[in-house]
Design a protein with these regions (language model features):
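Glycine/tyrosine- and acidic-biased, solvent-exposed loop/turn segments at the edges of beta-strands
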Residues: 1-184
């Protein structure tokens, strides 16, 4: 149909400068910068409806800095920071209605710290803590009505201590004890 698919710059036969791509229908698809053949700087993508889809930064062809994504309806979907291509710092995700779904902390691409999830109503769903990508300490989950579902403890990624399950009405369903991942 004669529609331009992409426009890019080259220097000595190597991609250098801004590159723009379009959907077949003519809407802009992406815009990114290159330095001597490598992604460098801001990269932006769009949904077919013209809404922004993602924004991220690159340094020497490696993701570095904040990455933000959006749903087709324009609502923010996620925010995550990167350092040298690895997740670093707070990671947050939202549902299509703008309600927070999850939040956690990453260190060197591994979950490290508190991680929380929520139901679409805003009610807390679960809470747990990680140390170097392994569960550590208390882990709990709640029913949608706010009543606790279960609570358990971890040490170096293994169940350790008391684990309790509750019914939706608050009555205890079962209790177990664990040591080093084994039921005692």
């Amino acid at each position: 149909n004669g529609q331009i698919e992409s426009e890019e710059n080259y220097k000595d036969n190597v991609r250098d400068g801004e590159r723009t791509t379009w959907y077949y229908s003519g809407e802009i698809k992406s815009k990114e910068n290159y330095n001597n053949g490598k992604l460098d700087g801001k990269r932006t993508t769009w949904h077919k409806n013209g809404q922004i889809e993602s924004e991220e930064n690159y340094k020497d062809n490696v993701r570095d800095g904040e990455k933000t994504t959006w749903y087709f309806n324009g609502q923010i979907k996620s925010e995550q920071n990167y350092k040298d291509g690895k997740k670093e710092g707070k990671s947050t995700k939202w549902n299509k209605n703008g309600q927070i779904e999850s939040e956690g902390i990453y260190k060197d691409n591994r979950i490290d710290g508190k991680r929380t999830t929520w139901y679409s109503t805003g009610q807390i769903k679960s809470e747990e803590t990680y140390k170097d990508n392994k569960r550590e300490g208390r882990r709990a989950r709640w029913y949608l009505n706010g009543q606790i579902d279960y609570e358990e403890n971890y040490k170096k990624g293994k169940l350790d201590g008391k684990r309790v399950f509750w019914k939706r009405n608050g009555q205890i369903k079962s209790e177990d004890n664990y040591k080093d991942g084994k039921k005692i």
